[in-house]
Amino acid sequence: MGEMIEGAAAGVPFVAVPPVDPGAPAALVAGWHLMDAPAGERAMAEAVPMAGLQAWRVYFGLPLSGARLPEGGYDEVFRRASEDAVLNVFQPVTEQAAGEFPAALAELRDRLPGATGPLGVFGGSAGALVALEVLARGDAEITAAAVASPVVQLAPVIAANERRFGVTYSWTERSRAVAARYDYVDRAAELTAPLLLVAGADDDIAVREPAEALRAKLGTELVTVDGMAHEFPPGTPGAAGVDTAFSEWFARRLRA
């Protein structure tokens, strides 16, 4: 993998890795990490390097993560999530990350040498939710997208967290409206670019079943990674499976 460039674009922290041939025109592939491992922009770059692409790979930091952790750090994020995961974490993270993407993209097009080619977006888990929202909004011309361990429907993920942490989430009219918005099976018609779905064979049904439903509705590709649950930390077989799937997908779909 080429040398990482670290910085901020329109206030959004990122790491970027240059294409195989830095002197030739390149595609731009931009995405967002998980809140689970890999839980940061550098970790995501190490887990899913997509090293063979003639593309700049840009890994954005999510709000409420890394350099943008609130005072109190991850303990404060967990406190907010335990208070209301939908309204305090998923909604603000997704809305901010999707909203800041167009300006960050425009700055990166200017700053990264040769990054004039087609655009791909990607993400994992909560970062996949951002990628799907960016794709649905249509604020940028996206040629292809890929998501791993994707939050395709928010409501089942909240139910999975209830099982995982032994808690009960108190739904309100407002949080139900947010969950309805973050239901990309229902909003499949808004996902107009070719989309690859990647899921771990051992992930929760809250991820696997909505991913399969979206695959069926779009008629798109779903890759299942054997032995992978939800996370795919750098250096694991799961990460290698996601990286292979993403790399092959974008190599087919993006031509600088």
Q: Locations of the language-model features?
A:
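Short, surface-exposed alpha-helical segments at coil->helix boundaries
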Residues: 101, 208-212, 240
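The feature captures the conserved acid-bearing segment of alpha/beta-hydrolase catalytic domains
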Residues: 155-217
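Alpha/beta-hydrolase active-site loop
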Residues: 77-111
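C-terminal catalytic histidine-bearing segment of alpha/beta-hydrolase fold enzymes
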Residues: 219-256
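Short, surface-exposed "cap/lid" segments of acyl-processing enzymes
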Residues: 10-76
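Short, flexible, mixed-charge acidic loops at enzyme active sites
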Residues: 68-83, 160-164
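Short beta-to-alpha linker loops that shape the active-site pocket of alpha/beta-hydrolase fold enzymes
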Residues: 61-65, 151, 228
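Primarily recognizes the serine-hydrolase "nucleophile elbow" in alpha/beta-hydrolase
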Residues: 102-164
